[in-house]
Regions:
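N-terminal helix-turn-helix DNA-binding core of bacterial DNA-binding proteins
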Residues: 24-68
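N-terminal positioning helix adjacent to the helix-turn-helix/winged-helix DNA-binding module
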Residues: 7, 18, 38-41, 95, ...
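Alpha-helical linker/hinge and terminal dimerization helices associated
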Residues: 15-18, 22-25, 29, 62, ...
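Short, hydrophobic-biased segments on the C-terminal half of alpha helices
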Residues: 55, 73-74
Length: 163
């Protein structure tokens, strides 16, 4: 069993390694396009959404700053991956966006690649283990989000006091 300090190191190094690998995989998937890795999740989200989404919704779903999403959405529209949803008159955070045919084609490639990656890396893990893993991962993510937002002073104080 890992000691507390070893768990911290293992967690940080593993998450960092996973993040780097995911970024390399995203770049590989879109290497024949003019897209950036940050675009992949937005195109995927628009593909799976039954309705058009706003830049604000894409920012919330991807936990990325709205101003970055807004700038990149302009690129995606200008490059022909996205268009304003029917009836939209101007661009803004609340303007609904939809995939163009070009955007749908690459979003489908992203979705197929994501599924292939999941099957490849999860092939040796049982369905029950995956359920537990994702449940624990989501709880850790939520807890870290609260700590990063609210600060760790209270937690650090309790740990130092031996609570």
């Amino acid at each position: 069993m890992l000691k507390s300090g070893d768990r911290f190191e293992t967690f940080i190094l593993s998450i960092d390694s996973i993040h780097k690998c995911i970024n390399r995989i995203k770049q590989d998937i879109i290497s024949d396009t003019d897209l950036k890795g940050v675009h992949t999740l937005w195109l995927y989200e628009l593909l799976k959404s039954p309705t058009a989404l706003t830049a604000a919704q894409l920012a919330a779903k991807s936990n990325i700053d709205r101003s970055l999403v807004s700038r990149e959405v302009k690129f995606l529209i200008d490059s022909g991956y996205l268009s304003l949803a029917e009836g939209a008159k101007q661009r803004g955070y609340n303007t609904r966006l939809q995939l163009t045919e070009r955007g749908r084609d690459i979003a489908e490639k992203i979705a197929l690649s994501a599924l292939a990656v999941q099957e490849s890396v999860g092939g040796c893990i049982s369905a029950d283990e995956l359920l537990v893993f994702y449940d624990v991962l989501l709880r850790i993510s939520d807890n870290l989000e609260h700590l990063s937002r609210d600060g760790i002073a209270d937690v650090s104080g309790r740990i130092a006091a031996g609570e």
